[in-house]
Structure formats: C-alpha cells, structure tokens
Amino acid sequence: MVDLESEVPPLPPRYRFRDLLLGDQGWQNDDRVQVEFYMNENTFKERLKLFFIKNQRSSLRIRLFNFSLKLLSCLLYIIRVLLEKPSQGNDWSHIFWVNRSLPLWGLQVSVALISLFETILLGYLSYKGNIWEQILRVPFILEIINAVPFIISIFWPTLRNLFVPVFLNCWLAKHALENMINDLHRAIQRTQSAMFNQVLILISTLLCLIFTCICGIQHLERIGKKLNLFDSLYFCIVTFSTVGFGDVTPETWSSKLFVVAMICVALVVLPIQFEQLAYLWMERQKSGGNYSRHRAQTEKHVVLCVSSLKIDLLMDFLNEFYAHPRLQDYYVVILCPTEMDVQVRRVLQIPMWSQRVIYLQGSALKDQDLLRAKMDNAEACFILSSRCEVDRTSSDHQTILRAWAVKDFAPNCPLYVQILKPENKFHIKFADHVVCEEEFKYAMLALNCICPATSTLITLLVHTSRGQCVCLCCREGQQSPEQWQKTYGRCSGNEVYHIVLEESTFFAEYEGKSFTYASFHAHKKFGVCLVGVRREDNKNILLNPGPRYIMNASDICFYINITKEENSAFKNQDQQRKSNVSRSFYHGPSRLPVHSIIASMGTVAIDLQDTSCRAASGPTLALPSEGGKELRRPSIAPVLEVADTSSIQTCDLLSDQSEDETTPDEETSSNLEYAKGYPPYSPYIGSSPTFCHLLQEKVPFCCLRLDKSCQHNYYEDAKAYGFKNKLIIVAAETAGNGLYNFIVPLRAYYRPKKELNPIVLLLDNPPDMHFLDAICWFPMVYYMVGSIDNLDDLLRCGVTFAANMVVVDKESTMSAEEDYMADAKTIVNVQTLFRLFSSLSIITELTHPANMRFMQFRAKDCYSLALSKLEKKERERGSNLAFMFRLPFAAGRVFSISMLDTLLYQSFVKDYMISITRLLLGLDTIPGSGFLCSMKITEDDLWIRTYARLYQKLCSSTGDVPIGIYRTESQKLTTSESQISISVEEWEDTKDVKDPGHHRSIHRNSTSSDQSDHPLLRRKSMQWARRLSRKGPKHSGKTAEKITQQRLNLYRRSERQELAELVKNRMKHLGLSTVGYDEMNDHQSTLSYILINPSPDTRLELNDVVYLIRPDPLSYLPNSEPSRKNSICNAAVQDSREETQL
C-alpha cells in the first residue's frame, strides 16, 4: 500500500491553488460522463407500446374506444337492414348484393378504416417474431373480412353495394369487452374476480350467438320469406328455448343449414361455458368469495382468524359475541386457510347465522385475502390459536405471524389475540387485548386449591348467561324441581359491568364517601356488588382499594349484577313497601329474588337491629358474651362513610389462631427461612412481577427432588419431610413456563406463612435448568419424575395426605383422530384416582368441556342421569352454559381452558374484563388493589345469620368485600329417583334376601352418589351372582339357601375394601407408613355450587365458603394497637413495606 501511494506524483502548484478556489469541480467535470438509462424505452415502438398496451389508463381508453367502434358497426348494419326495402324475386343475387345509401356507406368505410388501422398497429406492437401467429388469429381474420371490402370499395365504386357480414363484429366487440374489463381491474387496483369474468363471458357469448343467428337468418331469407329482424328474433328465441311453435320457419336450404350450424355451435360452446361457470361457483363456495367494499363501509363487521375452524369454537364465539344486544347488527367474517367442514357448513346454512356470518377461505398472511375480508374497515380482528395441536409452540408462531400481518395491513384495526405459551406473549404486546392460555390456566388451577371452585366462579363471570332473562322459563335451571339448581342458575346470570359514578343511580349518592361504605350500602339498597374502581386519569383498575379510598364523581365503578344499570327499572318507595309486606310471609333460605332487589330502590328488609348506635363488638366474627346474647341480638358496627383505619384489621378474621400462638423461637426461625420480595429469576420474558414469600437463599437443585436423597437431606418420600400442612400435587407432562404461574399465586405475600401448602410437581419428563432456577427461590416447592398411571409414584409423592391434586391436560394427547377423544387417557386416570383415593380432592383440566360429564362417572346413579337430562334441556333452550349443572363443574373439580375463550370475546364490549380477571387470579398486582381469598363459615359465625349482615361485618371490620358463596350440601333423592336407580336386573338379584333391614340398607346405598360407596360386587362377581340367581329354580330349597348365603358373603366384601387393601399393600412394599391413608373417609355424597352475588337476605349455612376481595395489606397501616393478632399482622405489613419500598 505504501508503494502504491509513493507512485502517485504530487499535483502541480497551479492545480492546488485552483482547487483551493474552485473546489473539486474543475477537474471532476472534465472526467465525468453523463449516463442515460432505459434508452430502449425511448424508441417510437416502445412509446406506442407504452400508450396502447402497458399504461393501464391509456390502454383502458383504447379498449373502450375499440369496443364502442365495434358496437357502432353492428348498429350501422341494423340501420342498413331497417332502411332497405324488400327485394322482389328469389334470385341468389339478393344474397351477395344489398342496397346501401351513400352516407351509410361513408360511415361504414370510416369505421372499417379506423378498425383495420388499429388492428394492424396492435399486431405490430405485439409482434414477437412469428408473423403467422398474428395473421392466423380469429380476431384478425374477422377484422380482415369486415373491413377490407369497404376499403376496396373506395377504389372500386361498383362494390359499394356488396354484402359484408358486418354483424360478425359482435364477436370482436366481445373480445374487446373482455380486454377492457381486465384493464379496468388493473386501473382501479381491484382484485379480478374470476366469477364475474366468467359470467360476463357467458352472457356475451349467448348474446353474440343470438345476434349472429338473427342477422344470418334474416339475410339468407332475402330469397325466401323475406323475414324482418323482429321475425328473426322471434324465431331464434323460440328455437333456442326448445319451444318451437313452428309459425315462423326458414324456407331456403341455406337458412336451414345455417340454423343447424348455429345450433351445433351453441351445443359445443355453451356447455363449456356453463361447466367453467359451475366449477368457479363451487370454488367460490369453498373460498367464500369477497366481502364487498360497499358493505364494509356501510355495515359493521369483525374478522375471526383461525388456522382451523371447529364447530365448538365457532358456536362459542357466535353465542358469546351475539349475546350482547348492541352487536346484533354486526357481521362476522371468518378467515380460515382450510376448507369448511361438513358440520360448520351445516351450521352456517341456518338462517340465524347465514345472514350474519361469512366464511372466507384464505390466509391472514396474504394481503389479497385480507383485502377480501376488508380488514382495514373491520371493527376488530380476533386471532385464535389452535390448541389441539401437538406442537403448541408452532401454533403460537403462526398466531404471531398472523398478528403481525394484520397489524401491517390494517394498523388501526383493534387486535384481540389468543396465545398459548407465555414466553411468546411479548411478541404481540402491540395487540389491544391478549389472553395467554397457560397463564390463566395455571393461575386458576392454583387458586382452586385455596379458594374452592375459583375456576367455576371465573367461568360464570365471563360467560353471558340467561339468568337475567325476563322470561322465567328461559333462565338456566328454573325448570328444575331442585331448589339449589334454581338458585344456582339464577345467580349464574351475574356479570361484571361498569358505569361512571356521577351518572349512576346505584353509586351517585356515595360521592365523597369511602369505597367500603359505597359497596355495602349499594348492596344493601340495590343488591349490586361494587368490586372495583378506576380513576378517570388512570388506566389501572383497583379491586377493593379499601376504606381509605374516597369515591370521586368521575370514577368508573365496576360492579357485579344481574344486568347493567342502564337496563334496570326502579320502583318507588311505596311499591317497595308493599312488595316487602307481601314477601315477608315467606321465610325460605333465599327470601327475596335477585331480580326483585335489582328493580327496587328502597331498603331491603334486613334485620340489623341496634347496629347504628353500637360500636364494633370485636375484631373477629366471634359471638359476643353470653350476657349480651340473652338481652339482644349481637350487634354489628356500622360501616363508616370515611373509615377510621385504626379499627380496620388487615389479617384474615377466620385464619388459624395457631399463627397467633407462635413462640419467639418459631418466629425467629421463620424470619430466617422466609423473606418477602420479588422473585429474582423469571423463566420467560413478560411475566408480571409479584411480591412473594421467598427463601433467603436458593435451594440446591438436588434438594428440589422429592424422592431422591442428597448430601443436604435424606428424605425419599413426602411423609418423611413432616409437613404441617397438606400437600398440593400437580401432575403435568412437562415443566413448562406456564407452571411458574401455578406457584406464584400460592406464594404471594398476602398468603399467611402458616397456611402455605407444600407444592409437589409430578412430571412425566425431567424439568430443565431454567425452570429449576425459577422455582428454587420459593419455599416448599418440590418436583418428582413420575406419572399418575403409576400407583407407586402417586404414593411416593404423598397422595395419601394431599389436600388437592391437580391433573393438567397433557399436550401430547390434546389432538386425536376422533373428536373429543383427546381426554380419554386423562379421564380414565382420574377415575382411577377417584376410586383409589375417594377422600382426595381432584381438580382436572380437560380439552373439551363436553367430556366433563365423564368425570367421577357413575353409570347407575340416577342423580347423574337426571342432571344429564337437565343439561340436554338447557342446550335445547339455547343456553351458553348447558354444562353448568354437572356436579364436577359446579363444585370446581373440572375445568377446560376453552371455557375462557369467551373472556377474549367479551373484551370487545367490556375492555376491562381481562384486567379484572388477571387481578382476581393474581397474575397482575397493582399497588392498592385487593386480591381474591376466601373464608369458611363455622358454627361460631352462624350468629351473623344473613349474607347482608356478613357484608356489613366484613366492611366495618376488615374492609373485605364478599362477592359470592361456595355452598356444599348433601345429596337428597326423592323416592321416585331412588327407585329409578335400581334396575330390574338388580332387583331380581336381591329379591330373595329375607332380611328387610338388609334390603333397606341396600336400597339406601343404591341411591348414593358414588356407586362404590355401598357394598356392591365387582363386575365379575355380580355376573356370577346373577347367573346363580337365574339357575335358582333348578335347585332344591337347601341348595337355594346355600347360594343365597354365598351371595351375601360376596356382598359383604366391598370394592372399596379391596382397593384399600391394594393401596396399603403397595405402601408397605415401598416402606411407607399407612397411617395417613384414610380409606373410608368419603365426601362424594355431597354436591357443591356457587352463588355469585346472592341476595342480601340469603341465609348463611355451616361450612359455607365466602369469596372475598381483600384490600391490599400494603396500602395502609393502622394507627392504633387493636389486638394482639392485629399487631402481628401490622408488623408483617410493616416488614413488607420496608422490603418493597412502596
């Protein structure tokens, strides 16, 4: 490089001085060469080609001019025929010579000259080296036939009356029309419609055939009948319609031959055109055609993008979307890359859906298909992932690309996206609303373990039910004879609504008052449950911000009610008093119907005597002293307008008192073990930070393995750890990132440390290191590699003393060849667990909600059969929640993530639903926002009596807001139902039993909800006993008595005892203690259900679990020293405040 630089000589001084004055322009201009590009387009031929062919607009004008010219020539031919006088005689000269006036001849010559010149010019411009290709084209030959004779007649005047078949120009006009339509579509930038073109070609072909036949017959009959144009038209229409009256017929052989030729041409050309049209029509039916621009601009529509459309997904979307009155005029455009299956096609042919649903086959990644769906004019776009795929990550990737494509094509279109894996969520943060399936699923299953039936509670809240229907017969469960089904169905109609406080009749009077005061009095007066609020200048929703929050006029209130306030009617005070008097004669558990409370503005008749003049009786719900009890009912402190937080407790009123009795040594050890803070490691990007109970130091990975000893501990089974609380076992296929959201809600900072349950992850596959890094900071979290198929694995992980077992649906089994068979393995495994461990609370996730009828299946249980019939009736009535009366769902024992699809659909109308659901599930934590928890009603709490008094007690003491009740009752069957449960064959088997008491016991046990509860034989034993009973008449009396005795001995050995013995033997074989196995404890003869926002006078019952939204403990600090328990809670809150720096 140095040598090259040394070879360059220095510039002379004069050049240096010139460069200083003029810059570098002087010598650069000397060497610069101007280059012109695209010189090939500057030739005369290329300029003509650009004007006549390439340029869209000029080419369209040329095509239009050519089309008009051909129509003009046909019009001149008709004028010539009409002006011509009929010739005399039948000489053949009339075929070759016609009478043509001079002006008409001049016009036809001019048209011929222009047409021929244009044809030759276009042929020259499109010439590509083969001259015969241009000459032998049919349009060029027709042009020569129709134009050259007129040009020759200019120089040879005797040929001016020569007949020229100018009517053949109609075919040239047809050809020009096709080219013009193509150029028109290019000019207006519109996607060409093959169906439109084909229909146009068919119509123009038919018209050309008829016009050619009319003119040809009329001319050939000049030597015959002398037909005019109208007679020729009549003859052609009659002939082509196959009617053939015969009143007008051709006479000459030439005209007859021409008619035969035209019929042959029609029989060849028209079927081809119809076949192509039919093919395109079928393809159009498959692809769905287009959604017109005019409709998109004048009507409202949303687009649903899916990779494959199943009938269940379609009906869930349509039922939920059109459940809102203001969406009745919307259209749904479905954009799916696959062909419509038979079931979907059948549904979309129903008039109710065919008028509002349009199916387009196409891909969201193609702008052409997005244009067909008019995505840029859509009100919203719903993009759903296909969960029934083996590779769910690949399904998410497709969803991400669809979302990007829609955002690129229509940036102003609101996006509602469903994603499966939480690690993929950050790719679509730009979407307006996102629902991550695994996040919601695991958080909901986790809360099910500490707040029973949370999954059912959330599912009912996000579904649009018919509980608010005016017609009683249309409401869920109102036709059932069971009272619990009526109450449960009516309360299921409660949903979350919003309204501005100053515009509300419910809440306007509470401006300037505390949130808890407004919540209690709104429920007392109107029966609505105020659960959250949002400032006008803030996007964050606060669930139960507590008694320190003062309501403003501009606040947006979120409340639970049967219907929104705008659809409610209010009675005056006199009407309410009359209704209260008439209603006071009934003293049932639910005295006032919900709808009557909603429609009233008066105060509900709640017995709160002496509550306005008495102070709080104590910090808990405990019953006051006996002396006070003898004089009057226990009093409840009133809810203050502006709360005095010195009397507000931040701890659970009904929490375990053992936490108060903790010794100083236990407190010291507890403080050393646990800390409060944010998890230092998150397994995926985009997880919401949650304040949790954490360990001071992370646990070594070897200590996370439950069934393997290491150098730090020597425990090899759950029993050896000596946990004080019962286990929560999660059976999953893999330790995905979503499983992290199962642990976080159970280790949230507001959960008491004494109530933390150990978590055991029973995994089919070993977890990876990233997942272990995330969970090693949480206390009492372990994993074990095993399967629920293996009894030994279940026993090692501590299933015998577990509080809950969560069975997560496996990804590898989510897809099956036959619909609804994806849950087969899960259902059978859970049924085995149900048989082996009847006292275990099992929470199962299924792929298809329809399969929940197989959970805890009892084929001969008449109560389950009655519920099956009720479900069918509700489905026939059009209910969106036909499965809600199934006992496993009502009790919160089964859940399907597809039930939460409606959460995304509801967000189109209620854009706050996703945020509220995430706050309830603990997926998001906002400072000042409360959390979902529960409390159990014990015998000491029954003095409160009603739900309204409980509402007041909670609001006045702790600031908690109750939102519902989880109630458990024993199953009671009527005599008729009991009789149904015994089949004829069983009755024949038991009719020989002489002991009436034993017969009654068998009869009573047969009505139980669990067929395995009473002493029945296994299947083979029953078959053997029946065979003996059928052979009975063949034996003597002594033999019959012997057979009867053998059958009684078999009955005494129950299936439950055999299973219990099997489990105990396996436990002994594994070296496990059998003390924790309670083989006879059974809670399966009960039914549980949820009452969302029950009426204020609903009676509390023993073992009711009340759902609470508790204020954030970190939002305030009490100023006084109430009780010892309260001070402990305040200290915990103070520690939390110091750690979080909030």
From Swiss-Prot:
Membrane topology, as annotated: Multi-pass membrane protein
Cell membrane as UniProt keyword: yes
Compositional bias of kind Basic residues: 1017-1037
Reaction equations catalysed: K(+)(in) = K(+)(out)
Tissue specificity comment: Detected in brain, and at low levels in heart. Detected in brainstem, including auditory neurons such as the medial nucleus of the trapezoid body. Detected in the olfactory bulb, red nucleus, facial nucleus, pontine nucleus, oculomotor nucleus, substantia nigra, deep cerebellar nuclei, vestibular nucleus, and the thalamus. Detected in hippocampal CA1, CA2, and CA3 regions, the dentate gyrus, supraoptic nucleus, hypothalamus, dorsal root ganglion, and cortical layers II, III, and V. Detected in striatum cholinergic interneurons.
Keywords assigned: Cell membrane, Glycoprotein, Ion channel, Ion transport, Membrane, Phosphoprotein, Potassium, Potassium channel, Potassium transport, Transmembrane, Transmembrane helix, Transport
Activity: how regulated: Are normally in a closed state unless activated by an increase in intracellular Na(+) and Cl(-). Inhibited upon stimulation of G-protein coupled receptors, such as CHRM1 and GRM1. There is conflicting data about the effect of ATP on KNCT2 channels activity. Intracellular ATP was initially report to inhibit the channel activity. However, others studies conclude that KNCT2 channels are not inhibited by intracellular ATP.
Gene Ontology annotations of biological process type: potassium ion export across plasma membrane; potassium ion transmembrane transport; potassium ion transport
InterPro entries to which the protein is assigned, alphabetical: K_chnl_BK_asu, K_chnl_dom, K_chnl_Slo-like, NAD(P)-bd_dom_sf, RCK_N
Biased composition (Polar residues): 1118-1129
A single Gene Ontology CC term: plasma membrane
The record's account of how the chain is modified after translation: Phosphorylated by protein kinase C. Phosphorylation of the C-terminal domain inhibits channel activity.
Region named Disordered: 989-1044, 1118-1142
Topology feature Cytoplasmic, residues: 1-63, 123-137, 174-198, 278-1142
Subcellular location: Cell membrane
Glycosylation sites: 99
Domain notes: The consensus ATP binding site (1032-GPKHSGKT-1039) seems to be non-functional.
Oligomer and partners: Homotetramer. Forms heteromer with KCNT1; heteromeric channels differ from those of homomeric channels in their unitary conductance, kinetic behavior, subcellular localization, and response to activation of protein kinase C.
Its job: Sodium-activated and chloride-activated potassium channel. Produces rapidly activating outward rectifier K(+) currents. Contributes to regulate neuronal excitability.
Family statement drawn from the similarity comment of this UniProt entry: Belongs to the potassium channel family. Calcium-activated (TC 1.A.1.3) subfamily. KCa4.2/KCNT2 sub-subfamily.
Protein name: Potassium channel subfamily T member 2
Organism: Rattus norvegicus (Rat)
